[in-house]
Amino acid sequence: MEITLFDPIDAHLHVRENALLKAVLRYSSEPFSAAVIMPNLSKPLTDTPTTLEYEEEILNHSSNFKPLMSLYFNDDLTLEELQRAHEKGIRFLKLYPKGMTTNAQNGTSDLLGEKTLEILENAQKLGFILCIHAEQAGFCLDKEFLCHSVLETFALSFPKLKIIIEHLSDWRSIALIEKHANLYATLTLHHISMTLDDLLGGSLNPHCFCKPLIKTKKDQERLLSLALKAHPKISFGSDSAPHFISKKHSTSIPAGIFSAPILLPALCELFEKHNALENLQAFISDNAKKIYALDNLPAKKARLSKKPFIVPTHALCLNEKIAILRGGETLSWNLQEIA
């Protein structure tokens, strides 16, 4: 059995920087046609020149791959900088509530403040797409739910602004997407295939720790259902986020799952298991092209076959290792060719 996926798109990707970027980028740039690149680096991409420099770094270490750059929404963002980013072709604005995830200490402190709303009003006029890490302070399993009032305010106040709930993790958010025409979402492999049991049901597994947290069986099943039917308002976004094993085994564990090396085989396995392989093309590419109005992307064909694939336990970066999701396991699908 074989399947060919055309122009795979990852609508939420972390490729880090410097040596780590060089080590992990190929796992995404080779099989994927394009990816929305996250701006929460150690020095966040809060201005246009820095964002364009990072884009150039990615392009220098990849080929036939389109990085779709995003600007980090922060308290110091000005209307002039927003206009400058627009003029340089940056189409994505990434909003992190302050302190909610990795490198979000520079995030937005007042989500419904006058300045935030003014920036969003202008982002709407300029045609930006707002990608939001939709969590608010509160009990860890309710953080996304607690952000619903903010999402509703944004959706109603800016009806022409496309708003993406990044890495949807709570089944209660599905109703918002159905209710508001301008609300969309991305789904990760880990949120549609894993639950809290994978993180802490046995021994604590730091390599399954991410934000937002993987949640209950009900959440996983409801989100998986959206993916399997390729809901038209949902696109795939891996949120692949590599960290060194030495940091993952420390006393202060960073959030992030490195899934890039297994994405296409694991998705094929999951969709075949549920008799939905015919919908994988829409989930992995077609929906994103429509939602984000993407065209002129590098043409790419990823051919996969139903043959065993033993997942490497780790990737290497200098003298450090990066644990790969499901490392050491055997998947039933294998990436055979990229053209």
Swiss-Prot record:
| Positions of Zn(2+) 2 binding | 94, 133, 167
Q: Where does substrate bind?
A: 14-16, 40, 133, 243, 255
**Active site: which residues?**
239
Q: Which residues form the signal peptide?
A: none
The regions listed as transmembrane in this protein's record are none
**Mind listing the UniProt keywords for this protein, alphabetically?**
Hydrolase, Metal-binding, Pyrimidine biosynthesis, Zinc
Q: Which cofactor does it need?
A: Zn(2+)
One cellular component term (GO) for this entry is: cytosol
Q: Which PROSITE patterns match?
A: DIHYDROOROTASE_1, DIHYDROOROTASE_2
The Enzyme Commission number assigned here is: 3.5.2.3
Q: Which residues bind Zn(2+) 1?
A: 12, 14, 94, 239
**Which BP terms in the Gene Ontology apply to this protein?**
'de novo' pyrimidine nucleobase biosynthetic process; 'de novo' UMP biosynthetic process
> What protein family does this chain belong to?
Belongs to the metallo-dependent hydrolases superfamily. DHOase family. Class II DHOase subfamily.
Its function?
Catalyzes the reversible cyclization of carbamoyl aspartate to dihydroorotate.
State the oligomer form and interacting partners: Homodimer.
Name used for this protein in its record:
Dihydroorotase
Upper lineage:
Bacteria, Pseudomonadati, Campylobacterota, Epsilonproteobacteria, Campylobacterales
What's the name of its gene?
pyrC
